[in-house]
Amino acid sequence: MSHKPDDDYDYLFKVVLIGDSGVGKSNLLSRFTRNEFSLESKSTIGVEFATRSIQVDGKTIKAQIWDTAGQERYRAITSAYYRGAVGALLVYDITKSVTFENVERWLKELRDHADSNIVIMLVGNKSDLKHLRDVQTEVAQAFCEREGLSFIETSALESTNVEKAFQQILTEIYHIVSKKVLDSEDNRPKIGEGRDVIVIDNAHDDGGKKKGGCCS
């Protein structure tokens, strides 16, 4: 069985991880891209990203997952971090209610700096620590319904729902972007119109296809 080389893909999607420090963003990244988990995760200086390709509807989707790498401690995340992002995983720790309370602030920052049509998923991480749960699932679900977000609970430690979370958000992005491409081909004068349009890159607005350039 032949595998496509890493640079052979149909779409490149930038997805950002945001949320309070210590909620498990780096481990979600490493679990999805390398199937690794570290109990001694240390904040990285600068911005870290990793990539992984998946198949959606017969297309190769290369996900470029960005991690804040500790910047959130200083509230120093810049607009450059969000630029070009078509998806965001907003992560909190189910055992620490303060990390859930801060979700609203993160959501506001995301909506202030990112494209208005970015796909957002709320992720309640550390579901393996059910005995220490401080945020009820129903409360988080109600928040997501109110804000129009998708929702999932994960455990990077046990690898529970990590794959599902990334597959779900990347599939949703793909369906929106591919619909945009079809719409623009069917009705060229209306390019850029419609509620579900995601602008991948203002200079190369081509639905995120590789030949239009990287979308970061």
Swiss-Prot record:
Keywords: Cell membrane, GTP-binding, Lipoprotein, Membrane, Nucleotide-binding, Prenylation
Lipid bilayer topology: Lipid-anchor
Highest rank taxon of the organism: Eukaryota
Gene3D superfamilies documented for this protein: P-loop containing nucleotide triphosphate hydrolases
Gene Ontology cellular component list: plasma membrane
UniProt name for this protein: Ras-related protein YPTC6
Motif (Effector region): 41-49
Positions contributing to GTP binding: 19-26, 67-71, 125-128
Lipid-modified residues, S-geranylgeranyl cysteine kind: 214-215
Signal peptide range in chain numbering: none
CDD domains in alphabetical order: Rab11_like (cd01868)
